[in-house]
Amino acid sequence: MGGQSKVFTLAEVSNHNNAKDCWLIISGKVYNVTKFLEDHPGGGEVLLSATGKDATDDFEDIGHSSSARAMLDEYYVGDIDSSTIPTKVKYTPPKQPHYNQDKTTEFIVKLLQFLVPLIILGVAFGVHFYTKQSA
């Protein structure tokens, strides 16, 4: 890796996306891994699926050995113009609406739904019981 390295745009690197011409972007550097496709332990399809984007996360998630990282040097062709790589949008879930933070009103409603029928039943039973004794 001596001298000035060539700087590529994402569009330029994205053109190299097949089994006869395969380039990857890893940690801001561009690698021509075409010759390595057949020898890659995970298969060439794994490498081809990582073309046209920043493959750094894919590379790091696998947990490559130090010898695999050293092999990258022989496939190095230049650097990527980082301004051409789209920024990752971090997903933030929408905040949940807080309809009823004070649960006391909900509790009172449930309590009344339980007690009102019992009170009606008790009154009906009492009326029936007292009218039966009087007669």
UniProtKB/Swiss-Prot annotation:
Keyword Transmembrane helix among record annotations: yes
Swiss-Prot/TrEMBL keywords: Electron transport, Endoplasmic reticulum, Heme, Iron, Membrane, Metal-binding, Microsome, Transmembrane, Transmembrane helix, Transport
InterPro entries: Cyt_B5-like_heme/steroid-bd, Cyt_B5-like_heme/steroid_sf, Cyt_B5_heme-BS, Cytochrome_b5
Tissues in which the protein is found: Specifically expressed in developing seeds.
Residues in coiled coil: none
Gene Ontology CC entries for this record: endoplasmic reticulum membrane; intracellular membrane-bounded organelle; membrane
Any one GO molecular function term: metal ion binding
Broad class of the protein's primary localization: endoplasmic reticulum
Transmembrane segments: 107-127
Binding site for heme: H40, H64
Subcellular location: Endoplasmic reticulum membrane; Microsome membrane
Domain Cytochrome b5 heme-binding: 5-81
Listed Pfam families: Cyt-b5
Top-level taxon of the source organism: Eukaryota
Bilayer disposition of the protein: Single-pass membrane protein
Family assignment from sequence similarity: Belongs to the cytochrome b5 family.
Purpose of the protein: Cytochrome b5 is a membrane bound hemoprotein which function as an electron carrier for several membrane bound oxygenases. May play a key role in the modification by desaturation of fatty acids in the endoplasmic reticulum, which in the developing seed is utilized for membrane synthesis and in the developmentally regulated production of large amounts of storage lipids.
Protein name: Cytochrome b5, seed isoform
Organism (species): Nicotiana tabacum (Common tobacco)
